[in-house]
UniProtKB/Swiss-Prot annotation:
Pfam families with a match to the protein in the record: GTP_EFTU, GTP_EFTU_D2, GTP_EFTU_D3
Stored InterPro entries: EF-Tu_GTP-bd, EF-Tu_GTPase, EFTu-like_2, EFTU_2, G_TR_CS, P-loop_NTPase, Small_GTP-bd, T_Tr_GTP-bd_dom
Protein's UniProt keywords contain Transmembrane helix: no
Name of this chain's protein: Elongation factor Tu
Keywords annotated in UniProt: Cytoplasm, Elongation factor, GTP-binding, Hydrolase, Magnesium, Metal-binding, Nucleotide-binding, Protein biosynthesis
Keyword Metal-binding set for record: yes
Amino acid sequence: MARAKFERTKPHVNIGTIGHVDHGKTTLTAAITMALAAQGKAKARKYADIDAAPEEKARGITINTAHVEYETDDRHYAHVDCPGHADYVKNMITGAAQMDGGILVVSAADGPMPQTREHILLAKQVGVPNLVVFLNKEDMVDDEELLELVELEVRELLSEYEFPGDDIPIVKGSALKAVEALTDTPTIKKGDNDWVDKILALMDEVDAYIPTPERDIDKPFLMAIEDVFSISGRGTVATGRIERGKIKAGETVEIVGIKEKTKSTTVTGVEMFQKTLEEGLAGDNVGLLLRGVQKEEIERGMVIAKPGSIKPHTQFEGEVYVLTKEEGGRHTPFFKNYRPQFYVRTTDVTGTIVDYTADDGSAVEMVMPGDRIKMTVELINPIAIEQGMRFAIREGGRTIGAGVVSKIIQ
């Protein structure tokens, strides 16, 4: 029997379930796979399978994440669900599982809770651009007015964090009732059961409301330099993995970071495994031959990019998860003016943490291992940085924190 080929006929979108503990994220994930499996568009996954999420390592941090996949008429989805709250925080900050959109699950019986708020804030900070809401456990609320109040509360909370609270689709239903119906009759079709129809209605909203992301290959070219060689008679070659976009010989690029001034040059050749390549694409490991550039002028940690697409910066705000002692992090707290290294793309840059802020905007004096915190950083050298970019915080070569750039200051 030949292995099934992965058909790339539909656009691919990465999503995930977020929300407070016990509001039904994993049950909803199971319900979606079961409802779509009834139409032959997914493999049905039980709650227990999803809940027993395997451990993964991302930037040296262990995270439990379950991955499921399914299709609708329009798209192919990869969906992440995390068993524990700490896993969500780590997942969203490290970008271990990239999310193009999220399904925020809120229990209609309880309304928004502290982690509901925290996940909305995190989605905003780490750049999950669009959310759709599933108001779960509708079967446990008899009072229609109460449902409307909870919906209003969710919309206000979304608006508070600068999501378009008035426009976001909210679908009411019961993930558990849908799972029970599909467990009894796995072949339920659309129109056979109200609870299952509500799950399908949710997926219709996700299809319509969460835009298809721009593919890496269509974004402006960027490659972080890993190594630099000089080839006699040919010039200087910079090697690295193309992060996004594409590159051909003859195109103009900028070399950005570390030095005060950005340098413009022309790519005279693209090579892979010592062979000339017509075009380098996102994901390729290539060598770029650069016109009129001396080996001394460029180094690891700079990036080569489409002119004007990225600028060097020294000051930014980051949302950071600080590793616990058990995760290999620090054993002791740190304070203002702490000076670790910030590992960005391919290099470590020393920076000073000038202040710490809690979720409510109040100043924090001391940061403990295991905390999630917003920090303002000043680097000693300018580096090509953009919003949504991931970084690690290191001390003597070991990772003590993971972060994402939430705002550029200068």
